[in-house]
Amino acid sequence: MTTSTGKINLLGLTQPEMEQFFDSIGEKRFRAGQVMKWIHHFGVDDFAAMTNVGKALREKLEAVAEIRPPEVVSEDISADGTRKWVIRVASGSCVETVYIPTDDRGTLCVSSQAGCALDCSFCSTGKQGFNSNLTAAEVIGQVWLANKSFGTVPAKIDRAITNVVMMGMGEPLLNFDNVIAAMKIMMDDLGYGISKRRVTLSTSGVVPMIDELAKHIDVSLALSLHAPNDELRNQLVPINKKYPLKMLLESCMGYMATLGGKRVLTVEYTLLKDVNDQPEHAAQMIELLRDVPCKINLIPFNPFPHSGYERPSNNAIRRFQDLLHHGGFNVTTRTTRGDDIDAACGQLVGQVNDRTRRSERYIAVRQLSADAELQDSAVRH
């Protein structure tokens, strides 16, 4: 993609695209592999540092291309080791990238949009409205920046980033081409060499793009379910009105069938106090997913200002998990990480230049609600 300088940003080019680029400037295709290794293996963003590339070619590259990662605005480190980067993209908005370390892995949570084109009622990102899709360079640039921060080389066995999840800001399938390109670079040995089983795309349910996915890439799939019936899901995840549960699950199963082996769908379910955490919801979920090869990841709600939702009690969370487990499912409850730096699931907000005015409307509605509560309280007293 050409940047504001009129040059091509090589950071976001897949291997075939990089080869085509070198063809276009009259150079041999093997140069693509050399340059990709410098960019992704060694974190180089200056052609002058590419010591096995001749001076004449380096000068040619300087004239027509660049390696431009997004700008890091800030970095915060949680008490539990979670890291969050605020990154400014070309649109002027800021997005957030989160690194979550555990004993046996390091997971990078990557954003795909500035804001989100969807409006899930319990997610702070959606309340920021929507500005733009990230470019492929801005998506893969989050991996590049994190590796640079850790000073790691992907060829090392002890690398910090072992898994990537497209679960940051935005709906990945509504930025299809750029997300696909970035994931291909993640898995390419000339890029970051991450196993396809360790790259996960999470979607709220854009059915046509799920159907298209298998034609382009083989990655793990996670479904943001959050409700066991259409009536409730229509409220929590409004895209369900367009693609209801039966259609959505058929699409997910169709994609999983193309992967073969023992791959299963990950089902994500944010638990909201007195909304979707009752025994009847667990029973409906067991029935809904009975024939779906899946594992279930329960996510206790992480509060944000004016959300209108609360986190269930620990007893309610355990009860819900136990009911699903007795129903025959592999169930885990996600440990909240990074909440002291607002890096927990559902808390990512960035700084979005909202083109939809959704954020403005959301704040106005919440203010009206707060004013009404104050008036009611005054009347009662």
From Swiss-Prot:
Primary location class: cytoplasm
Keywords for this protein: 4Fe-4S, Cytoplasm, Disulfide bond, Iron, Iron-sulfur, Metal-binding, Methyltransferase, rRNA processing, S-adenosyl-L-methionine, Transferase, tRNA processing
Occurrences of domain Radical SAM core (ranges): 102-342
Enzyme's top EC category: transferase
InterPro entries (UniProt xref): Aldolase_TIM, Methyltransferase_A, RlmN_N, RNA_MTrfase_RlmN, rRNA_lsu_MTrfase_RlmN/Cfr, rSAM
Sites where the protein binds [4Fe-4S] cluster: C116, C120, C123
Co-factor requirement: [4Fe-4S] cluster
Family matches, as Gene3D superfamilies: 1.10.150.530, Aldolase class I
GO annotation, biological process: rRNA base methylation; tRNA methylation
Keyword Protein transport found: no
Designated name of the protein: Dual-specificity RNA methyltransferase RlmN
Taxonomic classification: Bacteria, Pseudomonadati, Pseudomonadota, Gammaproteobacteria, Pseudomonadales
